Amino acid sequence: MTRRPVALALLLVVLTGCSTGSDQPSSSSTPSATTQTTTSQPDTRTPKPPPAPGVDSCYRLSYAQAVAPTARTEAVPCRRGHTAETFHVGRLDRVLDGRLLAVDSHRLQEQVATTCPKLLGERVGGTEEQRRLSMLRSVWFTPTLKQSDAGADWFRCDAVALARSTELLELTGSLSGVLGTEEGRDRFGMCGTAEPGTAGFVRVACAQSHTWRALRTVTLPGSDYPGESAAKRAGEEPCKAAARTNAPDPLDFQWGYEWPTAAQWAAGQAYGICWAPA
């Protein structure tokens, strides 16, 4: 039996006025010079907000586009290759104490960053544990400043699958309920290219070539970070037991454990991950 506990790597309208004029011919038979003055009346109509995105829309996004605060790409048919699927469109709470908040304010960005991850499970299915052990993530977008100035007040939540840390997996069809199936968990599960903690280790979707797989998570108790030593100790026995159960020979097996860092704990990740050879 060999083991390698390691610290968990950080996851992760433009309105245009137009006027026309007509030249009035002189009543005199003698040509004469004429002067014309054209005035443009201001358009006092209320701008119409741009339409909100639609739920169940799909997009071809790069990783950089997926983690940007706004999205400018057009939707594509979901039956074709894509990398993101919209599972929720909500409304921003833009008024606070009678003031209209900017779309890029911390409060509104926090609203979206909290809402979308909570709703991901309604789209992809599975248990909380199965979602933790997957490479499926939620990303979110708000209107651009220009769209917001025109009245847009929506936010959009998309589901994506990480092929690896900074690369999205190409998708076809819908992610609806995918983690409720063994096939979906095998495709989108969390795997590794080598033993966690070694130089060759890269976290990948299990659809990719891999040699290790995440087996379970270990939730750490309390609201305060317990410290590195306690976080490390908390996972050793649970991970060893999970690897033993998964191994062909319960007397000869390998296991690994990644525990959360203080920074990850502060970001909301209060669990470690157990690994074993695939």
Task: Give the label of every model feature segment.
Residues 14-17:
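C-terminal motif of bacterial Sec signal peptides marking the signal peptidase cleavage site
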